[in-house]
Amino acid sequence: ESLLGHVAKISVETVDQLTERDINELSDAAEAAILSGGGFGWLLPPPKSVMEDYWRGVQMIPDRHLIIARLDKVIAGSCQITRPPKNNEAQKFSCQLTTFFVAPWARGHGLAQMIVAESEALAKSEGFLMINLDVRATQDRAIQSFEARGFKRYATNNYYAKVCDDYVLGFYYH
């Protein structure tokens, strides 16, 4: 079957509930991202059941919003917007963008920019004035996505993460 002339269908949405199919697709996309070095903290994919439980848990936490991206109706990436804890009244104006990834097989279609744009729209609709995020310095494509949307780097941590016994630089943005 030829894909010549195929126009990829892309979409991004904030979701409250995931179907079992969604959880499976999200787990597969996250695993692919982890294996390509872009796995929001994981260095190696956990067992499938652990990954699936992780995504089930995300939808149970009221202070988390899950944003998913689809390529040809298959989940290909996501991120989360998290609220500060209730006891942190001094920072209630800001939220955190976390667990951002796009599976390697879905890159190059603009999904990363769409995910970040949806995150910004969601944060604004929830009354947040600022989005904070942090990222390993090795995550070049994620950094490009954030900077293209106007996020400004405000800090660097030389000991942000440890990969294969080596410390990895991390960047903080708002």
Predicted regions: what is each one?
Residues 1-8, 72, 101:
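Polar low-complexity intrinsically disordered regions
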Residues 13-105, 116-118, 122, 159:
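Acetyl-CoA-dependent GNAT
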Residues 90, 103-117, 124-126, 137-144, ...:
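Conserved glycine-rich acetyl-CoA-binding loop
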